[in-house]
Amino acid sequence: IPHLLIDKRYNFLQVHQQILLFHESLGGNSPTVHPYCAAWYKWPLLTRPMAYLYETATSLKEPLPVVGPPLPKGFGQVIYDVHAMGNPFLWWFGVIALILLLVMLGWQAVSFLVKKKRFALTPILSVDTWITLYLVLNYAANLLPWVGVTRCLFIYHYMTAVVFAFMAIAWFVDQCLGSYYKLLRAVGVTITFMILTAFVFWLPLYLALPLSPHGYKLRMWFSSWI
């Protein structure tokens, strides 16, 4: 790893220990430090995303002001907003999928212990079990280190963990679509449709596409999102 050759005081593990200690030594995880501070437990449910841009204009033809004060509140008829927030349905379904995976692992662990006591079976893990372990352990490994951090955190610190939540819902949907049961296939299709629809619905907040005040309010489902 190139950067380890530049500073040889720390090895690979020590570098990450220093990074974690740096974050743990900083305090001030509250809105008084920054309005968009979001503790780690707010990330999974997307309760506090982050606004990067908010500008208003009187019409679509009017260029956005590069410098200068914004228009008075309620005066602009067109809103341009960029939010650092994920697709809410993808986010929430991912958390549900992880919970289901945890339940599956717990059930398999209990079943294995019961069968082992009765029949002395050797442990053989299925491919699905390995996938479940991979997703749950990697999600936990990327989220739990932030539990002890007291500095001002933001939603983007969750990016390395949420990837595994996305993979969890993708795996769950794949299982549903490949099921023999019509109801499960319908669940898989419904989840996919809801995620795609939500992406299109919230796309203006990702790309700063023009919105009316009413359209902006429709997308701000919770006051903590603003």
Give the role of each language-model region.
Residues 52-131:
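Membrane-interface anchor segments at the N-terminal boundary of transmembrane helices
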Residues 138-146:
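Hydrophobic, membrane-inserted alpha-helices
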Residues 146-159, 207-210:
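Membrane-interface catalytic loops of GT-C/OST-like multi-pass glycosylation enzymes that act
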Residues 117-138, 183-191:
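Membrane-interfacial loop-to-transmembrane alpha-helix junctions, especially the N-terminal start
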Residues 115-121, 149-151, 172-182:
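Alpha-helical transmembrane segments
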Residues 1-76, 198-201, 205:
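Membrane-lumen/periplasm interface segments of specific transmembrane helices
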Residues 153-174:
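Hydrophobic/aromatic-rich transmembrane helices and adjacent perimembrane loops
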